Amino acid sequence: MSVHINAAEGQIAETVLLPGDPLRAKYIADTFLEDVVLYNEVRGMYGFTGTYKGKKVSVQGTGMGVPSMSIYANELVQSYGAKNLIRVGTAGGITPDVKVRDVVIAMSASHDMAQNRVRFNGLDYAPTASFDLLHKAYMTAKEHGIDAKVGQIFTTDQFYQDDFHHFKKWADFGCLAIEMEAAGLYTLAAKHKVNALTILTISDHLLTGEETTAEERQTTFNDMMKVALETAIQL
């Protein structure tokens, strides 16, 4: 048991999917997993363990942003022995190369994250995915006919921005999308010597203004889940 996760020893798998939305965690468990057990509902942040094609997999909601995600990632690794952390979530597209509902696999994450500014005394750290997970996810997408885009993304602390135009600079340097957790996850995984990957669905596009509905963001991103779960059973 940890401060924010009320699971018994052995209830959490070594591979954990990390959606930000706890209701998406429930949807994933109900839709894709078998023999599901609810191991956590502290603060309404649901955690489930089940099986996918016979492989034990957990799914844990994390909340939004690096500070909230970091609490759950730390406790999963330090208290429950998680070895593979796969974030599944949404992002905003910032380049014409990605469209709404595309799957993006985040190779690395530039950021404006305050935590790393403090952690590295103002120096720049390059949060990067685990290559083994990245390679498995990319090959899995290809095998299932899913046109996943692989590249750099941008992690921001601010959901509401005064000016979105500054993200054009990041797009000019190859960033595909914006989200709020990946850089923190990759940093923590490096610190604790575990594997981490972020797989995203583009839910809206800052260039075109196109967006998905709240219901779609919760329930319909099945290509992303196919890639994540088929990757998970290889670990």
Curated annotation (Swiss-Prot):
InterPro entries per record: DeoD-type (IPR004402), Nucleoside_phosphorylase_CS (IPR018016), Nucleoside_phosphorylase_d (IPR000845), Nucleoside_phosphorylase_sf (IPR035994)
Site (Important for catalytic activity): R217
Catalytic center residues: D204
Pfam families assigned to the protein according to its UniProt record, in alphabetical order: PNP_UDP_1
Gene Ontology, cellular component aspect: cytosol
List of residues binding phosphate: G20, R24, R43, R87, V88, G89, T90
Domain of life: Bacteria
The keyword DNA-binding is assigned to this record: no
Enzyme Commission number, as recorded: 2.4.2.1
Protein residues bound to a purine D-ribonucleoside: H4, E179, M180, E181, S203, D204
Top EC class, one word: transferase
GO MF annotation, one: purine-nucleoside phosphorylase activity
GO biological processes: purine nucleoside catabolic process
PANTHER family, alphabetized: FI09636P-RELATED, URIDINE PHOSPHORYLASE
Family the entry assigns: Belongs to the PNP/UDP phosphorylase family.
Subunit structure: Homohexamer; trimer of homodimers.
Role according to the record: Catalyzes the reversible phosphorolytic breakdown of the N-glycosidic bond in the beta-(deoxy)ribonucleoside molecules, with the formation of the corresponding free purine bases and pentose-1-phosphate.
Protein name: Purine nucleoside phosphorylase DeoD-type
Protein source organism: Exiguobacterium sibiricum (strain DSM 17290 / CCUG 55495 / CIP 109462 / JCM 13490 / 255-15)
Lineage: Bacteria, Bacillati, Bacillota, Bacilli, Bacillales
